[in-house]
Every structure is written in C-alpha cells, then in structure tokens.
C-alpha cells in the first residue's frame, strides 16, 4: 500500500455506510454498496489488506450514514432506522468488523433515536436526537456495551455543524469524552 510507504499508519476508512438514499450528499458516491453483505465483505478485505501493510483502519461513520439527505458538515442528520433494521444493516456490518479485530471507528455526528429509546424509553427529544459523538447511549451503551467494541473512537471533524450546533464548544468537548470519544479530529482550540 502506497500510504504505508510514506509513513501513514492510520486510515479513516473503510467507509461502511450503506447507501439507502441516493440523495445523501455525503456517501452517495463514497460507499461500497446498498447491499449489507457486499459492504461487509469488501470492508473486511480492505481492513485485511491495509492491516497487512501496517496501517490501522477506522471504519466510519458510526452509527451509520446513508439514510437521511442532510450533510453533517452543514446540518444535523439522523439515522431513522428502527432498532431491528439497524441491527440487520449497520449493526451487521460493524459487528462483523469487530469480530475480525477492527481497531478503531470514527463516530459520526449522526443521531440514532431508535437505540436511544431502547436504552431510555423516557429519553427527552434532546437525548433522542443527540449526535453519536455526544451520546453516551450510542457510544457507551450500544458500541462499548452491547457490541463489546474495545477499540479507539475518534470523532468526525469536530468543527462540523452536526456536532457544534448542539452546545458551546467548551461544553461539547467534555461531553464527547463523557459520551465515549477517545480522540478528536481537528481539535483546533488555541
């Protein structure tokens, strides 16, 4: 892999989002497929290939993009799938990668209200629609708890509106750590 030859040791890929909405501006041309099994198969091969070259993969954008038509760079965006549909799609892909030893994921600024409601039936609207990067329900209860992921969690770009529109940055950074993020992408505070 050329990246290894120039000293790159971490890749923000594979993009394991499932393209279920052709109007999605983020992943409509960046993901493997609309098909869950093909997405998993190609992602596993990508992961195997770059790990053989000494590069750690970070699958993204947990909990999954490709459902809504909004761009998290500019707006809030949820993943509207039911818990059962999420388990059969994004849950299947991430679970397969975790079983194969995926070392890291990139958390997206994407809400997953069905799972928040699963963990807290009395969740407030704010909790239901909190992006994964700021949601303990998604990163701690789902990712680390139910899915048993024990790798590194990096945020998607921390200046994207999907994250910054939720609270002041001075509150957002500790909230992301408390939710379960280990590292920030584009941490550019003075």
Where are these regions (language model features)?
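Divalent metal-dependent hydrolysis catalytic cores, especially in the metallo-beta-lactamase
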Residues: 9-15, 180-184
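N-terminal capping/interface segment
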Residues: 21, 33-34
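Aspartate-rich (DDxxD/NDxxD/DxxxD) Mg2+/diphosphate-binding motifs
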Residues: 29
